[in-house]
Amino acid sequence: MKIRWFTNLIFLSFFYGGISQVNEIIEFDSANPFSMSDVINRIEHQEKIKVFGKLTLPSENTVEKLPLIIGVAGSLGWRKHHYEYLKMFQNEGYATFELNSFKSRNITSTVGSQVEVTTSAMILDAYRALEKLSNHPRIDKDKVSIIGWSLGGAVSLFSGWLPLKNAITKNVSFASHLAFYPPCFIDPENTKFTQSPIHILIGELDDWTPADPCHMFVNKLSKTANINLTVYENSHHGFDSEEPIIFNKRGYSFKDCLFRLDEDGDVLMNFLSLPMSSPLMQKFGFLFCVERGVNIGGNATARKKSL
């Protein structure tokens, strides 16, 4: 599955070879929910925060509004290969938005903890950004897609879950969702997802966010959602980078986990089915199935195919 298929599926094709670009820093209001249940049931009571991102546009004074791709980084923050994808989209005439959920909260990484900035907070950020950018004079609000990697892949994937999405906004939607190696081991009881296309890309050997649950996830949702999966052979987490494969001893391996996501937005522990609705409860829940130590790095063949 190539990224160009993803973009051409929804958007008109533009090309601005070699032109200059302009950048805008866009700021908007968001909040700091920990769990999806915080968003669904208590969104008005969450700590408020200002979040920003960088919008990149062709400098040409075109009369047509532009399609936009919102990018969401993973637990290590924005990496070289993430920017390469944004640059590729820009070269093909798309506007891009680099969402800075981490920098807005003075965080550089959540590896080995996953509590400082959560999937739920970043999904809220993404929709608040979409609301803001939908009013931008050069953006076509009906042609805004989201792409994310790892933690950002979770944002891209679960921003399509309607109980969560509708609690945030019913006024705007993403035209498509592309998720690189997301946590498919979160199993939703409620299978109501957006009808916009969702595509998951993951490595066969991923021991951070394993591929097997993605097969189950897609099979479960395929009757009601427009969702597909591509698995790359002999590939680890971060297969789309050019970095060598290394062992990250702090990273959480979820290969033995399958967490249930209930109707209210609580992610439940294995066995005990208690909600992991706070940092302490999440840490306790991880004791039942999570191990330390994961492999991460690129695969040249998979990278080429994914582009």
Regions found by a protein language model. Name each.
Residues 21-64:
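N-terminal cap/lid segment of alpha/beta-hydrolase-fold proteins
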Residues 39, 75-83, 87-91, 101-121, ...:
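Cap/lid segment of the alpha/beta-hydrolase catalytic domain
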Residues 59-66, 71-108, 185-187, 205-211:
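Short substrate-entry loop that stabilizes the transition state in hydrolases
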Residues 114-137, 158, 306:
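Alpha/beta-hydrolase active-site loop
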Residues 138-150:
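Alpha/beta-hydrolase fold nucleophile elbow
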Residues 194, 200-202, 206:
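Short beta-strand/loop motif that positions the catalytic acidic residue
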Residues 196, 209-220, 244:
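Short alpha-helix in the alpha/beta-hydrolase fold that links the catalytic acid
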Residues 226-307:
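C-terminal catalytic histidine-bearing segment of alpha/beta-hydrolase fold enzymes
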